[in-house]
Amino acid sequence: MAKPDIHPKWYPEAKVYCDGEVVMTVGSTQEELHVDVWSGNHPFFTGTQKIIDTEGRVERFMRKYGMSESQGAGGKGNAKKKDEK
């Protein structure tokens, strides 16, 4: 048997919102759930290709590690500096 007063409140009619509109009703421990992607607009289920991530992985990597476009991969930017000295 479940112990009393230790379980979270259960909402059997919790509403799921995507882009401000209700897309489905589920059971949850929260009254409202806000999601960015659900099966109705996910590219795998709709068969369409949609870019969800606005910033590419390569650009994010370059920005994170402070690499500029001129340096490129493999440290080619540093080889020119050695030749100049």
Swiss-Prot record:
Instruction: Return one Gene Ontology term, BP aspect.
Output: translation
Where is the segment annotated Disordered? Answer: 64-85
| UniProt GO cellular component terms | ribonucleoprotein complex; ribosome
Q: Name one GO molecular function term.
A: structural constituent of ribosome
Which PROSITE patterns would you find in this protein's record? RIBOSOMAL_L31
Record bears the keyword Transmembrane: no
Which keywords does the record carry?
Ribonucleoprotein, Ribosomal protein, RNA-binding, rRNA-binding
> What Gene3D superfamilies would the database entry show?
Ribosomal protein L31
Q: What Pfam family is a match, any one?
A: Ribosomal_L31
Biological role stated in the UniProt entry: Binds the 23S rRNA.
Complexes and interactors: Part of the 50S ribosomal subunit.
What NCBIfam families does the annotation carry? Answer: L31, PRK00019.1, PRK00528.1
Q: Name the family the entry cites.
A: Belongs to the bacterial ribosomal protein bL31 family. Type A subfamily.
What is the recorded name of this protein? Large ribosomal subunit protein bL31
Gene for this chain:
rpmE
